[in-house]
């Protein structure tokens, strides 16, 4: 399961890893919370949505974008609260959580750690063989996170076994 965290829009996706670099899209969507609602209400709505997705799709692992300082402290703090809710939902079910920076995801998907949204959306559409690009960008980002993890998981397993 790939998650592009956000409090106003949170991208959620589920993919199935195949042989080699084959990845099959299962589901993609965006959870929206009202920007003017109380923080506690927004976090509750996000929690209910992600828990519903986890219950429905039964993922083995969760990949979440690591938040980084974007200049607006309030936005970063709200996103951090959301990430806490997302990580907790996974932890309550014993699901491992892997965090990836935006540049790690961009590099894995496009080969360029500085790829823009348009390039990333085009690449994820092509990689997954989608008829049309996922919208909004949060949905495409969630798919990119899931694919990134599928492709990196074998390397993580090798690295962890060598410890």
Swiss-Prot record:
Active site as annotated: 4, 65, 138
Cellular component terms per the entry's GO annotation: cytoplasm; Holliday junction resolvase complex
Coiled-coil features, chain-numbered ranges: none
Localization: Cytoplasm
Entry cofactors: Mg(2+)
EC number, UniProt record: 3.1.21.10
Any one GO BP annotation for this protein: DNA recombination
Pfam families assigned: RuvC
Catalyzed reactions: Endonucleolytic cleavage at a junction such as a reciprocal single-stranded crossover between two homologous DNA duplexes (Holliday junction)
Entries under CDD domains matching the protein: RuvC
Keywords assigned: Cytoplasm, DNA damage, DNA recombination, DNA repair, DNA-binding, Endonuclease, Hydrolase, Magnesium, Metal-binding, Nuclease
Residues that bind Mg(2+) 2: 65
GO molecular function: crossover junction DNA endonuclease activity; DNA binding; magnesium ion binding
Amino acids binding Mg(2+) 1: 4, 138
Assembly and binders: Homodimer which binds Holliday junction (HJ) DNA. The HJ becomes 2-fold symmetrical on binding to RuvC with unstacked arms; it has a different conformation from HJ DNA in complex with RuvA. In the full resolvosome a probable DNA-RuvA(4)-RuvB(12)-RuvC(2) complex forms which resolves the HJ.
Function as written in the Swiss-Prot or TrEMBL entry: The RuvA-RuvB-RuvC complex processes Holliday junction (HJ) DNA during genetic recombination and DNA repair. Endonuclease that resolves HJ intermediates. Cleaves cruciform DNA by making single-stranded nicks across the HJ at symmetrical positions within the homologous arms, yielding a 5'-phosphate and a 3'-hydroxyl group; requires a central core of homology in the junction. The consensus cleavage sequence is 5'-(A/T)TT(C/G)-3'. Cleavage occurs on the 3'-side of the TT dinucleotide at the point of strand exchange.
Family classification: Belongs to the RuvC family.
Protein name: Crossover junction endodeoxyribonuclease RuvC
Taxonomic source organism: Corynebacterium diphtheriae (strain ATCC 700971 / NCTC 13129 / Biotype gravis)
């Amino acid at each position: 399961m790939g998650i592009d965290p956000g409090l106003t829009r949170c991208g959620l996706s589920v993919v199935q890893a195949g042989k080699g670099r084959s990845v099959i899209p299962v589901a993609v969507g965006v959870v929206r919370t009202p920007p003017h609602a109380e923080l506690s209400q927004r976090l509750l709505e996000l929690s209910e949505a992600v828990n519903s997705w986890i219950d429905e799709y039964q993922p083995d692992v969760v990949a979440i974008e690591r938040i980084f300082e974007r200049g607006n402290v309030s936005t970063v703090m709200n996103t951090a609260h959301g990430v806490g809710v997302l990580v907790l939902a996974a932890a309550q079910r014993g699901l491992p959580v892997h965090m990836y920076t935006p540049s790690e995801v961009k590099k894995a998907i496009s080969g360029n750690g500085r790829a823009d949204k348009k390039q990333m959306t085009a690449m994820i559409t092509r990689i997954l063989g989608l008829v049309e690009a996922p919208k909004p960008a949060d949905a495409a980002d969630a798919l990119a996170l899931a694919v990134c993890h599928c492709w990196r998981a074998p390397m993580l397993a090798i690295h962890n076994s060598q410890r």
